[in-house]
Amino acid sequence: MLDLIIIGAGPAGLSACLYASRAGLDVLIFDSAAPGGKLNVTAQIENYPGLKPTPGPEIAFTMYESALSFGAKMEYGEVLNIKDYGDYKEVVTAKQTYQTKYVLIATGTKERQMNLEKENELVGRGISYCAVCDGPFFKNQEVAVIGGGNSALEEAMYLETLCKIGRASCRERV
């Protein structure tokens, strides 16, 4: 029986994996994609203390290596079900069922896409989902903000300090 299964190998999951395995726990981490989560689609990270501007995938790989450096294991695949039996949990995948004392869910977020042609290819190359993260790359340029509710307004207000807002649109009307 494992001590901990972590579902999600983005920055939060990898950090938890590092700390838990370093503390001597028997840890298994799952993800259905490459470790690193959103870092893998971030062209450049400029706002991480202690690092010079670095490509997101490079940081993701370094985090992955660190997370596994104390003996944790990684499995690729989708978790289909979690069953709680009180003293232990079962984590069910297509390949196998695992028993563990604890489960940590660190699956992150997924932005709602606009269904534009080639949208996936343009993420990190013109399409961004984080004004604070990527706004400085577009300083003094005209940008569009498309979103819903308060978050779109907050992003637009922040970007207005750096960029010219050519268009701000609520997703429901796009």
What are these regions (language model features)?
Residues L39-N40, N115:
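A short local structural element in Rossmann-fold oxidoreductases
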Residues N40-T97:
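N-terminal Rossmann-like dinucleotide/flavin-binding domain of flavoprotein oxidoreductases
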Residues Y19, T62, S66, Y102, ...:
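Alpha-helical scaffold segments in soluble metabolic enzymes
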Residues M1-L2, I6-S32, V123, Y129-R171:
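Rossmann-like dinucleotide/flavin-binding elements
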Residues A34-G36:
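Helix N-cap at the beta1-alpha1 junction of Rossmann-like dinucleotide-binding domains, i.e.
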Residues M1-I7, A23, M74-Q141:
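FAD-binding core/adjacent interface of flavoenzyme oxidoreductases
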